[in-house]
Amino acid sequence: QEKERQEQERIARMKSLGDILVLTPKEFEELTGKILEANGFHDVQIVGGSGDLGIDIFAWDQFGYKHAVQCKRYAPGNTVGSPTMQTFFGMMFHHQVQKGIFVTTSTFSRPAIDLAIQRDIQLIDGNQLIELLERLQQSSPLNSSLKIADKNQ
């Protein structure tokens, strides 16, 4: 429980892509998992790391569909291209998953976007990631308790 509270505090302090870029790949995957849970996904399984076969997270939506999630913590200007998107789609096929979500701290190239549209892969770029992080912070139990504390002062 203490670990969860510390995690919530760390998330509450994140304000920019710079704060996300200093996370380790595993921490970035864990943050993405929390964002997915806050947006209605359940049974979020973080499988990233070496040997993850190109899938970092599996998560189920409210309709019971399994989603494969790829997380790429790229520096600004390091665009996700179509070869990376093709590899992700290949791994979705390998794992027999129909729905994909690709999350990056940077942006996607036009060919990668076109491929994602063809393959029904949802894209979350750095700007959208910050918006989702802000929503997660607003819905956090820690944030609620901080608001109560502020009102009492």
Regions found by a protein language model. Name each.
Residues 1-153:
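Mixed-charge (Asp/Glu-Lys/Arg
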